[in-house]
Amino acid sequence: MITKRNIFLILLIILVSSASVYALDFSGNLTYSGQYNLSEENLSNTLNLDLNYIHSFTDEISIEGDLVIRYSDKSSANPLMIIPKEIYIDTYDLIPQVDIRAGMLIVSWGSSDMFSPLDNFNPSPPGISFTDMSRKSGVLAVDATYYLNDITYLQAIYLPNFTPSFIPEEYEKLIYLSMFSPEFQAQGIEIDSVNIAHAFPDHPVWGIKIGRSFTSFDAAISYYNGYYLNAFPETVEPIPGSSGMTLNLGLGYPKRDIFGFEFQGDFPGIEGATLRGDLAYIIPEPWEVQGEYALKDSYLKATIGVDYTTSFNLYLNVGYIWGFASEEGDQCSPYLFINAKQELKDSKFTPNYLGGISLRDWSMLNSIGASYNFSDDFSITLSYLFIIGDEGSKFGQMKSVEGLYLVGEWSF
């Protein structure tokens, strides 16, 4: 294991050195992330090289790419991953007043800093990260924006194929085994294993948005025609096997239509404060599992936030969320989040705090830490994340994320 890590470190150094030769086109960062899980008493490590490439062929045509090379000992099945996060051709004004991007894209909709209910084109890895909000995976897409004038634009997104969130097979089986085992145990049936079959949609995904700048704020309305990125159980069938009962589980991806409204601008009455908000009205495909509807009626999800920097350099971001990232339908509930960073005068230290509270069961998530900037290009952040609440509470279900986090980042 140590030898493999050393080889990978050498490869990373070679790649970074090669990139520096083409300094005009390449940029990126090298990040180490370590988590010490307090309950399991183990340390996991991730080394991430993110290379960004930009090359202009003409004033109107350029190519851009974002390649991620990641090594992690969290996954023994696939510790080394090479991920082309983005790679696309960008044409600007080749067609008058039209900007077109085509290739593997990350499409960001919504004005919120995190957990926007309008941001639905790109899947994310399993789990919810409170330390890295930029984990989305690229998808094959075309993004065309037509500028009607200096303050109004019309944007259209087209994905020829639906790309769901990826969950490792063994991890997915464990999730559904723990989900359905109690139900069958109550009937006197012991489930020993799970077989999973996915039914993927064969229709494209698309969306359209029109936005406009006003005197003190920007606003946009949008429509998304696509699917839920995470699978829902569709068929559940216990089958006798040679070594016990096997659960044959069919998973599908319900369709959904999302009508959205987003805005960003000055907060009334507080100079320098910014108000952001996203509102989604979601119409799901009715989805029935074992005689009960997992999805049926239309519902709302929303995020509203304010950020402000005080005269003594304290940055505050306060947000209200109705419907967390993992909640859909009648499971949606209210949360409050706060993010605070204090820049100290004549100091390279920056203390920070991230907190969230469920307004339904009052469970809490807290992350207390500090960053140290050795230079403009290199920094280290140490934080401690802990949960307050019962295991069945909203945040109590996330006890596995508790621990110490160390992140070192070098930009080049």
Model regions and ranges:
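Gram-negative outer-membrane beta-barrel proteins
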Residues: 34-40, 71-75, 108-112, 162-168, ...
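Transmembrane beta-strand segments that form the barrel wall of outer-membrane beta-barrel proteins
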Residues: 28-38, 62-73, 85, 100, ...
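Outer-membrane beta-barrel "beta-signal"
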Residues: 340, 398-412
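Repeated loop/turn-to-beta-strand initiation elements of outer-membrane beta-barrel proteins
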Residues: 24-26, 59-64, 97-100, 151-154, ...
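Detector for outer-membrane/organellar transmembrane beta-barrel domains
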Residues: 224-226, 264-357
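Outer-membrane beta-barrel strand-turn architecture
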Residues: 55-59, 93-95, 148-150, 213-216, ...
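Residues that define the transmembrane beta-barrel architecture of outer-membrane proteins
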Residues: 41-47, 80-85, 136-140, 202-206, ...
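Outer membrane beta-barrel
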Residues: 54-166, 170-174, 212-215, 389
